[in-house]
Curated annotation (Swiss-Prot):
The keyword Signal does not apply. One of its GO terms (cellular component) is cytoplasm. Pfam families: adh_short (PF00106). It comes from Saccharomyces cerevisiae (strain ATCC 204508 / S288c). NADP(+) binds at residues 7, 86, 157, 161, 190, 192. The lineage of its organism: Eukaryota, Fungi, Dikarya, Ascomycota, Saccharomycotina. Keywords: NADP, Oxidoreductase. Induction: By single-strand DNA damage. It is an enzyme of class 1 (oxidoreductase). It comes from the Eukaryota. SUPFAM superfamilies: NAD(P)-binding Rossmann-fold domains (SSF51735). This is Benzil reductase ((S)-benzoin forming) IRC24. GO terms for molecular function: benzil reductase [(S)-benzoin-forming] activity; oxidoreductase activity, acting on NAD(P)H, oxygen as acceptor. The gene is IRC24.
Length: 263
């Protein structure tokens, strides 16, 4: 039986490219893709077929529907070989001093539900299936450079990704490394819809002009990464396995320690 991989945020950007890379790297695997919008998921299924790519349109914070998906995977395959937790959101982009209303706190809560609590729930649900893999069950979290350094207006996002980094360490501490491993990867500044939103709406609304200028210049100088670049690293980790030496670690996509998996 081929590997069974679950990818969240699979309808666009890094997630969509990751589905393609995983299937093309391992033609025996089955990928389950989850996202809130269907168009990108449909295009992937048309390209690769329903036997290779199975998708569900849902919000990852909807625990009952995620439970149903995990149960479906259990009944059909009896195992799960890897997860890439890619789904995430950036909003609210706003300074801490301006985040002083009940609505602001609700936005923080929504972001943490998507970027962190839904992932905690998913991992807890999937651990038995990951441990049933004949290989090591690999959990790859898409983190961010904002988890380890401040970005103007990104406090909610950065805090949620920092929590994710710590969660990976906790998994590595609690679970036997011959059964389950976890790693956090910062994908770099990638040419995705999120970057467009930063340049056109979120950044002008919530960042200082100086802070926003970096992202604008990366775009103007064609320095944004193609999604294929981080997707290749994520695919290798979830398919070939997280090295034991990197279990629980946070790394940038181009960290030299990833050499063995960058291929």
């Amino acid at each position: 039986m081929g590997k069974v991989i679950l990818i969240t945020g699979a309808s666009r950007g890094i997630g969509l490219q990751l589905v393609k890379t995983v299937i093309e790297e391992d033609d025996e695997c089955i990928v389950y893709g989850v996202a809130r919008t269907e168009a990108g998921l449909q295009s992937l299924q048309r390209e690769y077929g329903a036997d290779k790519f199975v998708y569900r349109v849902l919000d990852i914070t909807d625990r009952s529907r995620m439970e149903a998906l995990v149960e479906e995977i259990r009944q059909k395959h009896g195992k799960l070989d890897g997860i890439v937790a890619n789904a995430g959101m950036l909003e609210p982009v706003k300074s801490i001093s301006q985040s002083n209303s009940e609505h602001d706190i609700k936005q923080w809560e929504r972001l943490f539900d998507v970027n962190f609590f839904s992932i905690v729930s998913l991992v807890a649900l999937c651990l038995p299936l990951l441990k049933s893999s004949p290989f090591v069950g690999n959990i790859v979290f898409v983190s961010s450079g904002a988890s380890v350094k401040p970005y103007n207006g990104w406090s909610a996002y950065g805090c949620s990704k920092a929590a994710l980094n710590h969660f990976a360490m906790d998994i590595a501490s609690e679970e036997p490394s011959d059964k389950v491993r976890a790693v956090c990867i910062a994908p770099g500044v990638v040419d995705t819809q999120m970057q467009k939103d930063i340049r056109e709406t979120l950044g002008p609304q919530g960042m200082t002009p100086k802070a926003l200028e970096r992202f604008t210049q990366l775009y103007k100088t064609s320095s944004l990464l193609d999604p294929k670049v981080p997707a290749a690293v994520l695919a290798q980790l979830v398919l070939k396995g997280i090295p034991d030496s990197l279990n629980g670690q946070y790394l940038r996509y181009n960290d030299e320690r990833l050499g063995p998996v960058q291929g």
